[in-house]
Each structure stands twice: as C-alpha cells, then as structure tokens.
Regions:
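Aromatic- and Gly/Pro-rich donor/ligand-binding loops
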Residues: 1-112
Length: 112
C-alpha cells in the first residue's frame, strides 16, 4: 500500500500531480493506493500511514518556509511516521529574483 497526500481540492495543478502520481505508482508497483487530504492533521491516520510502503507528498507550493505544519500539517511528532516520506511534484515559494533570501523554519528543517 502507498499513501498519497493531496491538496487537489485547492487547484487543478495539485489534482493533476496527484493523479499522475497515482497512475505512476499503480503502473510501477501495482499496489493499493490511498489518497488523504494534505490539509488535515494525520494523527488519526498514523496506523494506516505506517502500514504503507511510503508516504508521498503530492504537489502544492510546498517548498515554503512552513512546509511542515503549514503546507503539510502531518502529525505533531514526526517520529510517529515510520515510513519514508517522498516529495513528488512540489513547487517552490521563493522569489526567483532573490533565491538566497529563502529559508525554511526550524519545524520544516526537521521534516527535510
């Protein structure tokens, strides 16, 4: 089983990224795929997530200062997630004209 986190309810780009990830993993791994809402806290889904092969973060302007807890709330304690976390098609929220000014907050650095 694979768990995908999707923000597809917010925009079509996230839907397309999630759908492509679903098709790709279905084709390559022929495995059960579960799609969860990336906007919610996942405490109640932690057993499901930890029974998966891995957790995939699908789309969104996620490479942002607050990727963890802001863009992807996940769980309060990251050590509860025992499977690999894989980014797939994540966008960047920095300014192309000044990339050196971009940084992650301390919570996000723990996720990365």
């Amino acid at each position: 089983m694979i768990v995908l986190l999707s923000g597809a309810k917010k925009n079509i780009g996230d839907f397309l990224i999630t759908e492509r990830a679903r098709r790709l993993f279905d084709y390559i791994l022929d495995d059960q795929i579960i799609i969860l809402d990336r906007f919610k806290n996942l405490e109640s889904d932690i057993d499901l997530i930890n029974s998966a092969r891995f957790l995939v973060l699908c789309g969104g302007p996620a490479y942002a200062r607050d990727i963890y807890k802001g863009i992807y709330p996940l769980v309060e304690d990251l050590t509860k997630i025992k499977v690999p976390i894989i980014p797939f098609g994540l966008g960047w929220c920095g300014k192309p004209s000044d990339p050196m000014q971009f940084s992650f907050n301390s919570d996000s650095k723990r996720l990365l």
